[in-house]
Amino acid sequence: MEQYLELCRHVLEHGTERSDRTGTGTISVFGYQMRFDLQEGFPVVTTKKLHLRSIIHELLWFLKGETNIAYLQENGVRIWNEWADENGELGPVYGKQWRSWEGANGKTVDQISQVVEAIKHQPDSRRLIVSAWNAAEIEDMALAPCHCLFQFYVQDGKLSCQLYQRSADIFLGVPFNIASYALLTKMIAQVCDLEEGEFVHTFGDAHIYLNHIEQVKLQLTREPRPLPEMRLNPEVRSLFDFTFDDFELVGYDPHPHIKGEVSV
């Protein structure tokens, strides 16, 4: 995961200090891109241990179209707790927008189902896009979408995905986002009878919170280890049939976990 470490170095060297919504403060750059060849291994950070269970369950939760954290809590995932109300609700966040985007005419659109069908039947389309940024509903969301738009591209029997992330917490959030969208790409590739291609990660405001700088510097002292392999149950033929037990990460040998506080 040299690409991730290079991002960290770039922001430490070229970032400027900025205030932010949370009051923590950041060093930030605007505009950056990383590319990962998914056939070279599963892009999960090895310079600290990630909680893969949280990544997988969060993605499955998005795909269910849910916006209440009950499913996450039942599966030991706490990453959304700080933003939920007393009933566990988050408002019309990612799952709602992915699976039931509501238009001005009251019609709902299942963007995920639409994009999977388009990949299968119109692979050359330039409209293979899913957006979580519904401007009419931003104010009702507990947290505006950080990873807000992604597009697929089919070439030579391979499926690639590019994510645009408007706001990127480099220490805590970005490693999760890389793994999540790489996994989504693999899942969709499987159900569309394609091989996986590239994951392209494009950032708007890429930042390191001031209370994460020492943790990032610690990661930069650690040597990256070989990427693991993510195995999917080949029997699953529908994107919405995947369960947690259908995933196996083989050969993940990370450095120890590094703790960092979440800025809410």
From Swiss-Prot:
Annotated GO MF terms: thymidylate synthase activity
Catalytic residues of the enzyme: 146 (nucleophile)
Positions annotated to bind (6R)-5,10-methylene-5,6,7,8-tetrahydrofolate: 51, 169, 263
BP-aspect Gene Ontology terms: dTMP biosynthetic process; dTTP biosynthetic process; methylation
Cell compartment(s), UniProt: Cytoplasm
Stored CDD domains: TS_Pyrimidine_HMase (cd00351)
Matching NCBIfam families: PRK01827.1-3 (NF002497), PRK01827.1-5 (NF002499), thym_sym (TIGR03284)
Function according to Swiss-Prot or TrEMBL: Catalyzes the reductive methylation of 2'-deoxyuridine-5'-monophosphate (dUMP) to 2'-deoxythymidine-5'-monophosphate (dTMP) while utilizing 5,10-methylenetetrahydrofolate (mTHF) as the methyl donor and reductant in the reaction, yielding dihydrofolate (DHF) as a by-product. This enzymatic reaction provides an intracellular de novo source of dTMP, an essential precursor for DNA biosynthesis.
Family of the protein in this entry: Belongs to the thymidylate synthase family. Bacterial-type ThyA subfamily.
PANTHER family for this protein: THYMIDYLATE SYNTHASE (PTHR11548:SF9), THYMIDYLATE SYNTHASE 1 (PTHR11548)
Protein name: Thymidylate synthase
Protein source organism: Halalkalibacterium halodurans (strain ATCC BAA-125 / DSM 18197 / FERM 7344 / JCM 9153 / C-125) (Bacillus halodurans)
